[in-house]
Amino acid sequence: MPADPYPRAVLDLLAAAGDRPVIEHGTRTVTGAQLLGLVRRLAAGLRAAGLGPGDGIAMMLGVTPEAFAAMIAGYAVGARVVGVRPGLPGAQARHVLRQDIAAIVTDADPAQGALTVAELLETPDDGGPLRLSGRPHDVARLVHTSGSTGTPKGCAQTYAAMDAAWTARPAAWPPAIKELASRLQRYLVFGSLASQVMMEYGVLTLAAGGTMVVADKPAFPDAIVEHRASASVITVPRLYRLVAAQRAAPADLSSLRALMVSGSPVEASRLREARDVLGPVVFHGYGQTETGTISMATPSDVPPSVGFPPDVIDVEIRDPDGVPVPAGTDGELYVRTPAQAIGYWADPGETAEVFAGGWVRTRDLGHFDDDGRLYLVGRTRDVIIVNANLHYAGPIERALAASPDIAEAYVVGAPDEDTGEAVHAFVVPAAGRTPDVGSLRTLVRDRLGDGCVPATITVIDEVPSGPSGKPDKRLLEPPDRTG
């Protein structure tokens, strides 16, 4: 464990980079020394604003060198850094910003009372050693879940956990990460640095000696070609679309060496097809916001395995009674990682459900083979993964049932070429009422956001029942939309 707290390892990477380019943004190139300078000035600005250990700072930022530096500066002053994803529905954004937030930092038009990056950068750097104020047991960052339960849950990771992560420490990289790091010469960054995946691969790129390349328009394959990217994160739907585009009109992807598939499982045959069309570049990671990376399959691994968990990560497969099961037997995955969250911020009930005895209950189902490879086979949760975001069926059902036209609502998921999975709803009308599908979709969108809006809404007389007489959603078949 380093003598100085996080982000000492990241600052050391920037200092070692010196005049080497570490971020490209349009025509602008930022070196390690320049980015370190931005961190120092932004940390000074935050301290001048009275912010320090234990303070919550909401980062409402784009993807720029200053945004990356602001996140690191927040850690330098020992704050609780809260990345706010763009596009959050109003109610969810208000929920995040009311969770013990002392200040908002933005690079856009500031709301009343918000601090701007430009204002913070006006604070001069005193030239002395950059003081790091993080305390081991303080929460260093909150990474919010998708909000599919109605309000996003903030996974709380301490400074001690950030220090324990391997990302910025090459000597601690497991074999799959070493192989991936060797391909990160030009890592394409887009979307939001509030994304745990996007930010962590950015730090890994620094440690690997590569350059983060910002794509303001992340359409694939165009962005890969334009920026000569060697690596990028990709969701399952985007992977499928890229494979289809390459079959129809191949683009020059000769620079590409790694695509890190994130967010949801890839069907084995589709993964083989992707590797046939794109070459040996597809890495399939498995992890959760609560745990970080659990395992990663490299291009040489055989689908549908998600690879070997590193030695520093404990994975147990347990039966419904919590008893570990032997290799080859399916069960629920319980995971323990050095950098895992300690719980959900201000949510003791959900924390007790998921975090128990030092383990994280993933609520994913899988098994090991005799050689120790990990396989995923399903979920214990009633969730649908749309565009790599988990959306719980329950809140969608409750939103639909809030309509006076609806007596009962049931939601299921089904594979979808465009979004990985899609939400499909079945509704029983209230007596004498005729549901309006457009109004129901608007109701869900306003309450839970676009990702929860059903792709189809089917009116039924009653829900099918299982042998027990209870409603059985497994008997509901979504409409075939392949035609």
Where are these predicted regions, by residue range?
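Conserved AMP-binding/adenylate-forming core of the ANL superfamily
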Residues: 2, 21-50, 58, 64, ...
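Flexible, low-complexity linker/hinge segments
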Residues: 1-5, 118-139
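Conserved AMP-binding A3 loop
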Residues: 31-33, 140-167
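AMP-binding/adenylate-forming catalytic core of the ANL superfamily
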Residues: 104, 337, 342-343, 365-452, ...
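Gly/Ser/Thr-rich phosphate-binding loop
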Residues: 207, 230-233, 245-303, 314
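Conserved ATP/PPi-binding loop(s) of AMP-dependent carboxylate-activating enzymes
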Residues: 308-312, 323-354, 389-391
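Conserved AMP-binding/adenylation subdomain of ANL enzymes
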Residues: 166-186, 192-231, 245
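Conserved pre-ATP/AMP-binding loop-to-beta segment of ANL
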Residues: 19, 127-144, 151, 177-186
